[in-house]
Amino acid sequence: MNYNQTLEFLFSSLVSYQEKGPEAYKPGLERITAFCKHLGNPQRNYFTIHVAGTNGKGSVSHMLASVLQQAGYRTGLYTSPHLRDFRERILVDGEMIPKQKVVNFVDKHYDCMKELGLSFFEMSTALAFDYFDQSDVEVAVIETGLGGRLDATNLIIPIVSVITNIGLDHMALLGDTLPKIAAEKAGIIKKSIPVVIGEKSD
């Protein structure tokens, strides 16, 4: 398959939030944990910064990646969703993952993805982890997809966690009050790992 055929295949065979909405949400780390073990746990081979929040997490992630790159670090950036091209989600030093890398990853691991029942986001996350490792990234900025505690990205052990703000969003999935939503996003906080909070409410 070529790149476009691969994407069409993935969108038609793996459940995606963009296509199905809330029914595509598959909380839990069991599937991504098993798949990353299958890959050799590539996410353990470089430093990571984890970013969550209701608003601003994409902008903060891009700014952090830019600063790190300018400081001389080989930098990965994983965000979602994309605007025009799926590859916008996965950048190394500002360059999108090559199309052939996406095709090769799917060709090699699709049977395992289907067996585990991965969602499209879980596949994308694992692809990013693997590509960053292959690209000898020194530090990767990883943006959560939805929430934090049960988000597929929460497999990482970051050097710092960032929570930009908390608002009433995805209430059907994360909870119907700010404290409930905050608890989900605070799930990216790890013991003995620094946390930066971007906004405080009175």
Please report, for each region that a protein language model flagged, where it lies by residue:
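Short functional linear segments
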Residues: 1-53, 60, 66-71
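Hydrophobic/aromatic beta-strand patches that form the interior of the parallel beta-sheet core
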Residues: 49, 76-78, 160-162, 196
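Internal gly/pro-rich beta-alpha loop/helix module
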Residues: 159-160, 172-202
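A short, flexible beta-alpha/helix-coil linker loop
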Residues: 16-17, 167-169
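Inter-motif core of Ras-like GTPase G domains
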Residues: 154-165
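Fold-independent oxyanion-binding glycine-rich loops
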Residues: 79-81, 143-146, 165-166, 184-185, ...
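ATP-dependent carboxylate-amine ligase catalytic core
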Residues: 22-29, 33-44, 70-156, 172-175, ...
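Buried hydrophobic positions in well-ordered alpha/beta secondary-structure cores of metabolic enzymes
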Residues: 51-54, 58, 125, 141, ...
